[in-house]
Amino acid sequence: MEKDAFDYYASHSSMSDLRGARAVFDSLPNDPAALSRVIQGLGVYDVVARDFYGFQPPPDRLNEIHLRPVAQRVGRMLTLDSKPLHVRRPPERRALGRCNSFALLLVSMLRDKGVPARSRCGFAAYFNPPKFEDHWVCEYWDAQDRRWCLVDPQIDNVWRSRLDIRIDTLDLPRTHFLAAGEAWRRCRSGEADEESFGISFAGLRGLWFVAGSLVRDMAALNKMEMAPWDVWGVQPGPADELDFAFFDGLAALTSDPDATFPELRRRYESDDGLRVPAAVFNALTGRREAIGVDATIRERQKAFAPN
């Protein structure tokens, strides 16, 4: 991996930075597997909270899934239960989240230890096979094996039992999680059916959905880790005509971010349709929302953009 990319992904983003509260991570273990177990004791996936964990989230807590920056999410976790973060909470005292919040929390913990890590937006094959469901995971640099590893910190023993998940979610096979660019490539080449990619229970699927995920993955690779329902810029709707050449180019850039790192950074920072604005449209709430990050940190991120 190029040193510029190594340094970039080892440093915090505006979304992953705890800012003045980093001491709360001091008691945490070092390895990704142990950190994933910690995270599983801090968060609960709202959609399955009742059926999987016996906890019915009250209406006044449902907005927790919209907390984007880790600093806000950890603050909420400590409001629900003030014990140190390594202490496992019962489900009713865990913060509500979705796949992106589990992934970003692991990214934050690893970056805090100087480990290169990044959120990846794509599609997982282990929730509803043979479908590829919209999903986010953490990708971190394993210095010993000198390779990027995919980790899904959301999947605990409850998920494993309920969905009969047998793969190693601490070192995900690349066949079982496709980053958005790879999903796009397979759909475009005819290797995969575009109707297999999306959110099955919501009836959202198709190449337009893959294109939107590709924009979110591009943003995440530029350390703007957004929510799955955040919409901005060039993300298409289901009835929009797709610019195939444009998204083919994005897929090529994101397929090997280390090799394309300088161009990936330049392209993102120079394209208003790709770059995350100060406010985005939240497709779940139906309104525009400020993304809630420190502009100073965003400017510091831009300093990493190659000349």
What do the predicted segments below correspond to?
Residues E2-R93, L105, Q301-F304:
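Secondary-structure boundary elements
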Residues F261-N307:
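Charge-rich, low-complexity intrinsically disordered segments
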Residues E2-M15, S36-Y45, D51-P59, F123-W136, ...:
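His-Asp-centered catalytic microenvironments across diverse enzyme cores
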Residues L28, E92-C99, L207, L214:
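Aromatic-acidic/polar surface patches that form glycan- and anion
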Residues E92-R120, C138:
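Cysteine-centered nucleophilic/redox motifs
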